Amino acid sequence: KGVKPENIITQFNVIQDSLEIWVNDPKPQPDTFYVSVRYMKTDTLGMLNSAVDEFKLINPNRKTFGKSSKKDIKHEDTTAVVKIEAAPETVEQYGFVMEFKYPIVESAFDSLKFISINPKQEESAAGYTVTQDTVNLRKYIVRPKDKMQVGYEYKLKLPHRKFRDINGFYNDSTEVKVS
């Protein structure tokens, strides 16, 4: 109640038994949310019927603005955390997998640098495609446009401040290399 539907991001897990909810609104939010969930429920006769359940969600980790030591603040608390993985033996099939800790609300995938390095160690820009995972909205797959060549190394560079997560934090630069 009180949050516009366009400011809510939801995602089910793989087996569809858990729902993750994020509020995409920079304004301070209350520590308690009341959520109405409308779904199809099986009754005692095995028939599907529309049902509405109300849930009270309390944030047990709500951060209070008090005195906190700078020692308590970790780097992950102030940046959009992204993990990039690529296995050399499967990178051609599965690509470079980028997974953000939280949903991103601003992105600049055209700023990625995909570089091929030939056996003479000469670098050249290579084309790539980006697709969002169909199950996990925080995961993106970066694949080369051209067939990968034997003996070449490939590097994916993510420049800093090109992606902003739902918490308002920007990413750090990172680089992953496979051969």
Q: Which sequence ranges carry the predicted segments?
A:
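N-terminal targeting or signal-anchor segments and their processing/structural boundaries
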Residues: K1-S179
